[in-house]
């Protein structure tokens, strides 16, 4: 099985694994060949959500949005891991969270390939999407986009093209942290546009964000 990294990138990550072994995205314990830390697994189970959360599109005027899903509540070890990925430069944490998201939402079995967690391919017949699009970052100062890193294993497992440049942010807006659902929707309204419309026009898009 091939992973979702190019060969040079995979070799570079293998070298880093020798010096800096894989760690749990929640508590940073060394994982070895385990997909998740045995200590944090029950903590994650406590934060699990239902498989799909349907939005009231008539209330929020999101007619183009079919639904939304989150594998975990944004609390505890999940919140800590996402904040480290966003603000402490732990890009690897974003990838590990993406692997876990893929396993929880789509039932992909995670295997180890050259010391990397790789979700097994999921049958495309039951997926119903044409592409995976990560939400653009508010700032590029961290050097990477957290939703894009999370979307990499997801796109691999679903055998879908990952389109990181399909959307662009046209205004920064306020930080979403601490905002209510209605405030988040108002804050995000008009903040993005299709940078390359031909990539997503008429497509069923699986949009990925970190929170």
Question: What are the functions of these language-model segments?
Answer:
Residues 1-211:
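Glycine-rich phosphate/pyrophosphate-handling loop used in enzymes and phosphotransfer proteins
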